Amino acid sequence: MANMIYTAMPALPKKHHTNAVVLPSEWNTCPLSSIVEEISETVGTRKIETISISAGIGFVNQAEKFGRELSGKQYEKYIVLHKGDFSYNKGNSNIYPQGCIYRLNNRTEAAVPNVFESFRVSVGNPDYYEQLFLSGFLNRQLYSKINRGVRDNGLLNLKGKDFYSCEVPYPPLAEQERIAEILIQCDHVIELKEQKLDELKQLKKEFLRKMFPAKGCDTPEIRFPGFTGAWEQRKLIDEVTSIDTGKSKFTPQKSGVYEILGSTSVIGYDDSYDYEGDFLLTARVGANAGELYRHSGKVKISDNTVFIKGEQLDFIYYALLHFDIKRLSFGTGQPLVKASELKTQDIMMPVDSDERSAISTYFSNLVHLITLHQRELEETKTYKKTLAKLLLTGIVRVQG
């Protein structure tokens, strides 16, 4: 039986070990320096847009990022990139601890700091190597070459010669082109899904504005058919059970029977609870003060969390999103939202409970649709990431 199985199995492709990764035997490897040309062209006296690299985003206008334009000797030493050129930002970040490499795709030319390693691919398919860099292929090698620690300017201790000594795969050119084509198609699909998600989020924002009365008005701009008449102004505290600040005492555990609610989400677990019901919650102090989230059940609530408890909170939730309780935050330091302020807050409500239900149902369905699109987008990104790893290292081969 074993012989039959082995006979039926196709021969495994031959592999060879490199300093970078295990690759198909017909793929070559080479130092980055052998396929790229370092860029040394400086700005000098020319006026060229200055850009920087933002981890996870790519190239961004430097004035927009830092709030100022550069001039003088420092600017003159900036490196000129042309469309299709690459830059490696040696600044470390949480998502890119070994720095990140991006390609200039949406500008004809631009100037980048001369502390970046800037280069263009002169041998091989630039699209293939863009995908290789985006996949983080160099990270393991960079980690081994970086002198531990970060310099005073926030850059990693990595010399240019060490960066360019990193080994990269060099598949047959036709295969490079086919791999790049497949992964670029994935990027296009991701871009379309991101656009659709942005459109849905913008739709939600617009309808929150139009389906609730504007300040000083008692009817919304848009209503469902069959509903007329003015909305009423009511005290928020009169429409809910209670508004308060969490007072639970606890030592968070990684597991337990009951959830502990913090300023933005669940922060741990405990074996006892202090509160039970349906809640709207927000941070009491800090950058998240005024950002609402929902939760139901038996819970503990931290002292940095303001909560609203009640029944049928759907309409209240969307009414408060329209109102934007961040406007209630105050203080010269960090933003602060007080339960006492919320208790005195007025909100506009339809007299007809059916209209409240119709509005709540509409937004609940829209939020559900946004969640589905968000999940689909993340799944597509994961699929592309996995596919890139398989294709870029030859684990899965494609016809050139």
What is each model feature region?
Residues 53-67, 109-110, 252:
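Short, basic/aromatic beta-hairpin or loop at an interaction surface
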Residues 13, 48-52, 62-72:
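Short, structured beta-strand/loop micro-motifs enriched in basic residues and often containing a Trp
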Residues 24-28, 167-202, 222-234, 346-385:
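Amphipathic alpha-helical segments
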Residues 79-138, 151-152, 262-321, 326, ...:
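A short beta-sheet element
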Residues 1-22, 192-232, 377-400:
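Short amphipathic coiled-coil heptad-repeat segments
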Residues 12-43, 173, 223-246, 251, ...:
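Non-catalytic DNA-recognition/assembly elements of restriction-modification systems
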